[in-house]
Amino acid sequence: MESTLGLEIIEVVEQAAIASSKWMGKGEKNTADHVAVEAMRERMNKIHMRGRIVIGEGERDEAPMLYIGEEVGICTQVDAKQYCNPDELVEIDIAVDPCEGTNLVAYGQNGSMAVLAISEKGGLFAAPDFYMKKLAAPPAAKGHVDINKSATENLKVLSDCLNRSIEELVVVVMDRPRHKELIQEIRNAGARVRLISDGDVSAAISCAFSGTNIHALMGIGAAPEGVISAAAMRCLGGHFQGQLIYDPEVVKTGLIGESREGNLARLQEMGITNPDRVYGCEELASGETVLFAACGITPGTLMEGVRFFHGGARTQSLVISTQSKTARFVDTVHLFDRPKYIQLR
């Protein structure tokens, strides 16, 4: 799968990032997202595959493109038989976030990117549009920290695993009222807190790379992005755990569903019989082969944002895989027409 799709999924996120970055700083988050969705879908439909969106822009009646259940790729088209051999075809599940951090793009802030994860059919957890309690940590802490422990306990464990004092640790937390007590506990334990307004996928992945000065992600964010983060962390050998949040009182706002009982019923309909289960990255991204790709829209911890020059643009992307156990940073110059010069730095 990697040998045939690796380069193409990089191009998918590159095109989404370029499209969205043209709306950077214009205050139009919905437009920045919409053009990224269009660009991502158009490029995916040119790939020799039969793909199915398991995490996308929403339910079919809520999203015109890249909705959950939508099929993408050349081999899903009406005349697919002339292009595709069914005996050689691998069906693929896809999780996408064409513009992760729409507010970041709209207001010209750092940390937004276009992301996707793919695996064979059934290899990615089809998370409902709920919230998820998350814990991400470096590979050295995998299996040692635990989402059921307090932040204080996990910081002590993390300190031992990384051979650092707690005062040297940096924990990323979403800047939300629901995290007031968590933030205070982290600070009381002696660690430092980096608050972010959006974009916790980037924060989770950054835990797996030394030199980012991010050592953990804690708190509650969107469940679909949790699956994408888990796919990346599985490729990188990092620690990731997620637990679905189905009680609206926990997050106070924005949760799909009006009641705890209604949300529990919805989970039951989806076949989730243990709503309190803690999922590891091997369960959220359980496929034999998992690929993850991201491209910076605005500058971030791991990647530069899209940089335009006369006649073209330059992007930085990341592609990682469970198969090759590699993390490739890809620097690409895109020539839209005959440029007067090519941007090198």
Curated annotation (Swiss-Prot):
Its EC number is 3.1.3.11, 3.1.3.37. Pathway: Carbohydrate biosynthesis; Calvin cycle. It is an enzyme of class 3 (hydrolase). Belongs to the FBPase class 2 family. Transmembrane segments: none annotated. One of its GO terms (cellular component) is cytosol. Mn(2+) 1 binds at D33, E57. It comes from the Bacteria. Substrate binds at E100, G101, T102, Y131, R176, P177, R178, D198, G199, D200. Pfam families: FBPase_glpX. Keywords: Calvin cycle, Carbohydrate metabolism, Hydrolase, Manganese, Metal-binding. It catalyses: beta-D-fructose 1,6-bisphosphate + H2O = beta-D-fructose 6-phosphate + phosphate; D-sedoheptulose 1,7-bisphosphate + H2O = D-sedoheptulose 7-phosphate + phosphate. The keyword Repeat does not apply. This is D-fructose 1,6-bisphosphatase class 2/sedoheptulose 1,7-bisphosphatase. Mn(2+) 2 binds at D97, E100, E225. GO terms for biological process: fructose 1,6-bisphosphate metabolic process; gluconeogenesis; glycerol metabolic process; reductive pentose-phosphate cycle. Homotetramer. Signal peptide: none annotated. InterPro entries: FBPase_class-2/SBPase. Catalyzes the hydrolysis of fructose 1,6-bisphosphate (Fru 1,6-P2) and sedoheptulose 1,7-bisphosphate (Sed 1,7-P2) to fructose 6-phosphate and sedoheptulose 7-phosphate, respectively. It comes from Microcystis aeruginosa (strain NIES-843 / IAM M-2473).
